[in-house]
Amino acid sequence: MTSTPDLNRRSFLGATLGGAAALPALAQSQRDFSGHNPVRYPDSDIVVLDKKFAKYKINNTAIHRLHTGMQWAEGPAWCGSGHYLVWSDIPNDRHMRWLEEDGHVSVLRSNAGNTNGNTFDWEGRQLSCEHNTGRVVRYEHNGKTTVLADKWQGKQLNAPNDIVVHPDGGIWFTDPGYGILGFYEGHVEPLRMKEAVYRIDGKTGQLAMVTDELFKPNGLCFSPDYKMLYVCDTGHTHYPQAANIIKVWDVVDGRTLRNSRQAVSMDLAGKGSGLADGLRADKDGNLWVGAGWVGPGYDGVHIFTPAGERIGMILLPEICANLCFGGSKGNRLFMTASQSLYTVYVETQGAHIT
């Protein structure tokens, strides 16, 4: 596989996937997210495609925009101990924070290495994937920063992207290299190594590559029982032969992967095929997937059963890069979508701590 580092993923997508926006699409409301003209219940942009999804839709709630003004919002993660959401504004090189108590939004951290993905570990410490520095870091409670991973077999990592934790203390992350393919999200240089998924051992700190079979591994999450790992492949941004899919593996002893197979296709009959960027599992094993680059009636969140059946959609007016469950009851979905942060209550909870 030969990458094309002269094209960043935004310009490439505009040329390759943008044409899909002209395809027929599901009806999407022309709504006012300012709050001056509230939407009528039930919210028509929470779409039930199959009766299996009906129980997750709350008919007297609506999608809300919590904040706007970012350049490219990514990496939402819920801090249960602090009752706040953190997310990345990659081009502006900062971490943002939304407080559950009063909805206040502020810059949590500047000069964040063009961070993309974030999560929290079992001790409530923020873990972040830095595009520009090629590092995975942990922010300690005392304010110090610990570098958890920056090299594989002596070579600097490309640009870590998304990250999750395992109950055994292991930290899993993807490295598709986007952060060194353009100045907008990092800097420009050739890929240093093959795009891959890695695991940091929670006890020894040793880094291991667990798979490099995807074109560009992006968002990732575990099944509720941690026996399977799902990873989005956004390889079509730079490899035209790559399919827009999510793959799944069996997790062996919490350390290695086997039995690779396709879990989800992002094709939507009669509408187009966009990218699955980030994803999370709910407690029933359904996948909630940030999707986009097709247009109205597609962009937003797609919900799939564990068998890969698309049962629902949350339509947004912007491309949804990533999402997480949070809130005091774990039943609130937070969605980072292009320039904005959105949220909606759902009748389920996230499977994991963030």
Please report, for each region that a protein language model flagged, where it lies by residue.
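N-terminal secretory signal peptides and thylakoid transit peptides that target proteins
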Residues: 2-20
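Blade/loop signatures of beta-propeller domains
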Residues: 31-61, 353
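Blade-edge beta-strand/turn elements of extracellular beta-propeller
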Residues: 56-68, 104-111, 142-154, 198-216, ...
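Beta-rich, blade/repeat-based domains predominating
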Residues: 68-84, 111-130, 135, 153-171, ...
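Short, solvent-exposed loop/turn segments at conserved positions within beta-propeller repeat blades
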Residues: 90-91, 132, 181-194, 238-244, ...
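A short loop-to-beta-strand structural motif that recurs across blades of beta-propeller domains
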Residues: 94-96, 135-137, 196-198, 245-247, ...
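Short loop/turn segments immediately following beta-strands, especially the blade-tip
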Residues: 249-255, 346-351
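Blade-level signature of beta-propeller repeat domains, shared across WD40, Kelch, NHL, RCC1
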Residues: 326-354
